[in-house]
Design a protein with these regions (language model features):
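A transmembrane-helix-recognition feature enriched in membrane-embedded lipid enzymes
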Residues: 187-217
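N-terminal type II signal-anchor transmembrane helix
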Residues: 6-46
Length: 222
């Protein structure tokens, strides 16, 4: 009798293990399908038909982003430029001095003084969105071009649309040389980067579903 009970207990345990394994495999399959779908949403190029916007915002994280923002400002595609997430010890002169002169458009001193703003409060993508939303309200702007790395664009757009529902947000991706979007699965560094970005995107997406009113809770630096 005791042996029968042991056998029944072992049988139930194995059933639970199989069910948990099956559940894990289902979730893993869904995650992989989602990853592939996420990668297909990453921009592959810049829209050649650029419409002018009230402003442009650069999310710090690479010189290519800043160069792109300055080019949009210099070409008249944006009235003002916000650089969001700047270190508190950095000023405009320091930022401009960090760029290659040959890659930097020439801007008049008065343009730099009037039309480039630095945001010091954001410490993550949510913070970037909130910082930009505050600045847009102060400037009374209604359209903005978002400049960040292509792989970062889906999550950035999600956060910006959430923080600024009444503002037109247009993507302007840049493409870091070290990120290999084509055949990304063959490049371990790029694969790791995209997996981490996809997981962050899922967290941001789930946060919006569970806490739809949390746009104002993004952490900012004092």
């Amino acid at each position: 009798m005791r042996q029968v009970r042991r056998n029944e207990t072992e049988l139930r345990r194995r059933r639970w293990v199989r069910r948990l394994l099956l559940l894990f495999l289902v979730f893993a399959l869904i995650w992989v399908i989602g990853l592939v779908a996420f990668v297909t949403r990453i921009p592959r190029g810049v829209d050649p038909n650029l419409a002018a916007t009230d402003a442009a915002v650069v999310l710090t994280g690479g010189s290519e982003r800043l160069e792109a923002g300055l080019e949009l400002l210099a070409s008249g595609h944006a009235k003002k430029l916000l650089i969001s997430g700047v270190n508190k010890d950095v000023d405009i002169a320091t930022l401009l001095g960090s760029l290659e002169p040959s890659q930097t458009p020439k801007l008049a001193p008065e343009t730099i003084a009037c039309c480039i703003a630095l945001g010091y409060s954001a410490e993550d993508t949510r913070g970037n969105a909130l910082e930009t939303a505050d600045w847009m309200r102060q400037e009374r702007f209604k359209s903005i071009r978002l400049i960040t790395a292509a792989y970062h664009m889906p999550r950035s757009l999600l956060e910006f649309h959430r923080a600024m529902p009444g503002v037109q947000v247009l993507p302007y991706p840049v493409f870091p040389r070290q990120v290999k979007q084509e055949s990304w699965w063959r490049w371990p560094g790029t694969t790791n980067l995209l997996v981490r970005e996809y997981n962050k995107y899922l967290v941001a997406l789930l946060r919006g579903l569970v806490l739809p009113g949390d746009a104002g809770l993004a952490p900012v630096r004092p």
